[in-house]
Amino acid sequence: AIFTEAKQNGQFRAFWKTFDESVNLMASGEVVIQSMWSPAITAVKSRGIPCVYQPLEEGYRSWGGGIGLSKSLSGMELDAAYEYINWYLSGWVGGFLMRQGYYSAVPETSKDFMSENEWGYWFEGKEATDVITSPTGDVLAQAGEVRDGGSFEERMGAVACWNAVMDENQYM
């Protein structure tokens, strides 16, 4: 009710409901500040539009994800599930996620699937030594630029709130 009233009074341009809405609001210039996911920042930057993921003084809001197995799995299904988890954590997925601004549960394995320049930029918070691109090849940063918020340790060390899927999620 508080946010709805504030929106009606002109405080907010919109409450986005989808990833694409958040990107389009920022890319169009309709908004200049919003809560966005890291890949949404990447999507805006890939259009050649400057966009900064501004670290908050209070700290970051962060999400964690995981893979769980049903206790009813056995035999070939259990083997396939473990094979999938092993592949998922082996580094390729982590490298793909990192090029959007996310991290893998095992970020070190991503290093084998990234260039030294990419690893330095996305994980270590170093200046890019060459162009940084998204997973789809769009230019995100030029040589000399650094990632918003710094290194993995700096970013994860500043998380103030870990979000999780709420109980009501299944009804939304």
Put a short name on every predicted segment.
Residues K7-Q11, A27, V31, N86-G94, ...:
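Sec-exported extracytoplasmic/periplasmic mature domains
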Residues G65-I67:
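Short amphipathic alpha-helical segments
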Residues I49-R61, S72:
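Short beta-strand->loop
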Residues K17-D20, S35, G75-D79, G149-M156:
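Soluble non-cytosolic domains of exported or imported proteins
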Residues S70-Q142:
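Mature extracytoplasmic/periplasmic domains
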Residues T133-M172:
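Conserved C-terminal helix/tail region of periplasmic/extracytoplasmic solute-binding proteins
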Residues S38-T42, E58-R61, G91-W92:
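Solvent-exposed loop/turn segments at secondary-structure junctions
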Residues A1-Q54:
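Ligand-binding pocket segment of bilobal, Venus flytrap-like solute-binding proteins
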